[in-house]
Amino acid sequence: MGVHLITGAGSGIGAALAALFASRGQELWLLARDEARAGELRARFPRSRTLVADLSVPGAIRARLEAQALPGRLDSLLHVAGVAESGRVGELSAEVWQDTLAVNLIAPAELTGLLLPALRESRGHVVFVNSGAGVHAPPRLSAYAASKFGLKALAESLRAEEFAHGVRVTTVYPGETDTPMQVRLHGQFGLPYVPEAHMSPTSVAAAVVTALDLPRDATMSDLMLRPGC
């Protein structure tokens, strides 16, 4: 039975991944911001186990999680949680920059470092759900894009460092996906939201699982996804 830890499982791509793994009878570990959200996740995915840590507080994740029972082995660690605020560079506050970098970049680095022994034990797989903004930085999303460019660099360094330990690393770059974040960003940009013009989170989850299911002699290092026609 595979063992998988997911951040951001409350909605969107993270929830779709959790549902897909649950349908396969896999062991799920879901990270929640607080106890209330952890209870919601356990109710939605009854066989899951939850961990509680606030990804927006750098440096506190390790201390919080080391006080909880952690998996002894991990087949995959999936970084899906993310935040985004729109605004021009001259408009974004230092707090927005700090929060965005904390959740989207620093937390994945800290969490991965903490769980490397469990990943090495099972020759596991780390998946970073990035964004098209991690390839081409659009206007009015500078903090988000900067965090995603940094996440790309983190993945590349980790891949080189952990190759000898058999840990595989994949970065997924989804195009526009039908998630609450996209709905909110369209509202901030004053754009109409058309769900049919977006990929479903389930489609992105299926692509991620394809990367996880590859034989050991192959690694999908980067996965670009765009809405179909």
Regions found by a protein language model. Give the residues of each.
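Active-site helix of classical SDR
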Residues: 112, 147
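C-terminal helical subdomain
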Residues: 167, 171, 192-229
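Active-site-adjacent segment of SDR/Rossmann-fold oxidoreductases
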Residues: 136, 157-167
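Residue(s) in the substrate-gating loop at a strand-loop-helix junction
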Residues: 131
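Substrate-binding pocket helix/loop in short-chain dehydrogenase/reductase
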Residues: 88-89, 96-98
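Conserved glycine-rich cofactor-binding loop
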Residues: 10-11
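Conserved glycine-rich Rossmann-like NAD(P)H-binding loop of the short-chain dehydrogenase/reductase
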Residues: 24-40
